[in-house]
Amino acid sequence: MVLQHNTFDRRSPSSRTDAIVAYYDETWLDYRFFWLNEKTLSVHFGYSDETTGGHADSLLNMNRVLADRAGIRQGERVLDAGCGVGGSSFWLAQQRGAEVVGITPVGSQVAQAKRFAAQRKLTRHVRFEQADYTNTLFPSASFDVVWSLESLCHAQDKAAFYREAARLLRPGGRLVVAEYMRTARPLGNPSERLLHKWLDGWAIPDLDTPDEHRSSMSAFGFTDIQIDDVTAHIRPSLHRLHWITFWSYPLAVLGRAAGIRSFVQHGNVLGSLYQYHALECGLWCYGFISAVATSTDMPYSAS
């Protein structure tokens, strides 16, 4: 028997949302100082290949590689499901000419994204709303592409996201996801404990396996499903985060002891350390997922 190690997914839905909001509210300065800049506005990992010259390049390259995978064209309507402060939304509007709607449950991210959109003079092409990507108010068949970059992990029920994506996409519309995936279920008690030490620190309830993702997509009519392990391209970015957290950990401990750093902020640092350990133990991988929508007969799910 595998014990339940995750404390996050035993919370109520509203409590889980509150935890996600608290995570991004309280860790924003860490991301701002150590990870992103005004050009990237990215709270995701970078994709390294022969074209990238450093950390910032890899963050932007992630957008390019995913956009190529989805075949995003000028004038297409894209839902950025879990948009953060708008980094990918802005890139898609500027580099691909897309019309983008970004959604996130985090109100402070919506406010920041709107401010950044105004600064970039992109308000005609990008808009942001506070919403749950598993249960939106958008009309059916209203998007050409649904894009999820390291945001699906926060959903308690990944299948609910795929159900809503199938409803929102026009026939022939494309889904593209970049996400952490567990390598097996179950992993065994010690491995599950290690994995969830990371996930709890990042307000993530659990990860699905590649086969679980495929099964959910198939159930809601997606075809041309492709799932690829691209961990090798993410490793430089993962190593960078590990290096940052390893060397900053003593200061984080002191900050927590002094009451300067919150429980959530300290959990983010611990989670980052456990994430790399779990990777080295082969407990998870980083995957690209893409698929094509075939119908619009998914029931309207908004309550």
Set out the residue ranges of the language-model regions.
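A short acidic, Gly/Pro-enriched loop at the edge of an enzyme's catalytic core
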Residues: 134-146
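Conserved Class I S-adenosyl-L-methionine
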Residues: 226-303
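N-terminal auxiliary segments of SAM/dcSAM-dependent transferases
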Residues: 1-34
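A short glycine-rich, Lys/Arg-flanked "PGG" loop and its adjoining helix->strand segment in the class I
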Residues: 159-174
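Class I SAM-dependent transferase core
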Residues: 22-72
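Short alpha-helix
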Residues: 205-221
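Class I SAM-dependent methyltransferase SAM/SAH-binding core
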Residues: 77-79, 88-135
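Short, glycine-/aromatic-enriched active-site segment of Class I SAM-dependent methyltransferases
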Residues: 181-205, 217
